[in-house]
């Protein structure tokens, strides 16, 4: 496809923004089909894989959470419960031993220095102890890995990429595909910190801001050893030969459930995978996510026919460290009243807040309603210019704003240790349905609170029978009863809820 000299028109929609009613009609049929599929999270095992041996991997007791590095109060702890049951399925005859220390993985001194000094990690988390040997032990097998938010998944694939590439070769050897620009930038930041002493460089393949636009024909070829980006931009760079794929050793899909879902980015993801596998031969493929529904699992296990698998049991995917509540309100105005008069009265004392809404218009409405009451807040959704999104994210991360209103553009992978409260202003539902919950999105949303094992609280604001139906289905699916704040007008009830969550004395 020829590249013109005009700057690209900003995308009208993002995967994370629910289309307004007239925009959604074209997707309704496909979405309804997706909604009718099973959403079980039980591990999918290929019945024909007779050589696969199921292992019950035990991790030594000293495997506490590793440091998360980064804030003034010391390294945050990972969500690394002693009760976590990791179900592993290995392919072939390789025997993997869990790693009690990063030194057990035969990493370079430069990588160990980055892990300990720059990242503040002391030892592998439970998921890292099991997963990293599978990634780093020859022969290099593909891997499907599901683990809960905050368990250390990012370190697994970032360390995998840094370990596999040769810093002396100025060619791209590792690619990581992400669903959003923000997640791509965040993963690059982690890689650059962890690999600070290795000399490895990383390019970020995301749609440029208007002011930074350069016609792709004029772009130089990418010589960074690692490229992290969104699927659309990566496809353009590969198609225009800005990235040469014949030296790729490792291909990572972060939030793989969405990257390979039919209503996500499956088309681009499959094309990138085919192109790399065709040109690079035995490229190792790593698929990481907190959730995999049954349809995605079925697709993935057909694509990855001879790989290892790691799954956390379904009942552990409820994020017990995050206290969830439901709040019955009579109307939309009452939702705003609850936020500003009840939750904010205590929420501002304990940390930052993310309010999740369903549509771009709702983002504006909630933002306007709160600013009219003199609350300082910011809002983000997919149609904003890239520079605007970056500015808003950075201001929130720096603590300049305490309240962020967002569509699901931030539901996945956004790490901000100071976020203690999440408010579901709108419950997440699947495209084209009235009351079918999007279980994966719900899990990812509540995972924004209490990152790295810290405590957090989630308030689900329910208005009418539809919201209550969605909430009941979520409780049934995750086998978790969400307690109710008895009176939406009672300050005492909200204060008691936050005390129970461990957020106020």
From Swiss-Prot:
Region entry Disordered, spans: 1-81
Gene3D superfamilies found in the cross-reference section: P-loop containing nucleotide triphosphate hydrolases
Low complexity composition bias: residue spans: 27-44
One MF annotation (Gene Ontology) recorded for this entry: mRNA binding
Motif (DEAD box): 254-257
Subcellular location: Cytoplasm; Nucleus
Keyword annotations: ATP-binding, Cytoplasm, Helicase, Hydrolase, mRNA transport, Nucleotide-binding, Nucleus, RNA-binding, Transport
Chief localization: cytoplasm
A cellular-component GO term for this protein: nucleus
Top-level EC class: hydrolase
Motif (Q motif): 100-129
Known EC number: 3.6.4.13
Entry keyword Amino-acid biosynthesis: no
Chain sites annotated for binding ATP: 147-154
Family statement: Belongs to the DEAD box helicase family. DDX19/DBP5 subfamily.
Stated role: ATP-dependent RNA helicase essential for mRNA export from the nucleus. Plays an important role in the positive regulation of CBF/DREB transcription factors.
Domain characteristics, as noted in the entry: The Q motif is unique to and characteristic of the DEAD box family of RNA helicases and controls ATP binding and hydrolysis.
PANTHER family recorded: ATP-DEPENDENT RNA HELICASE DBP3 (PTHR47958)
Record-given protein name: DEAD-box ATP-dependent RNA helicase 38
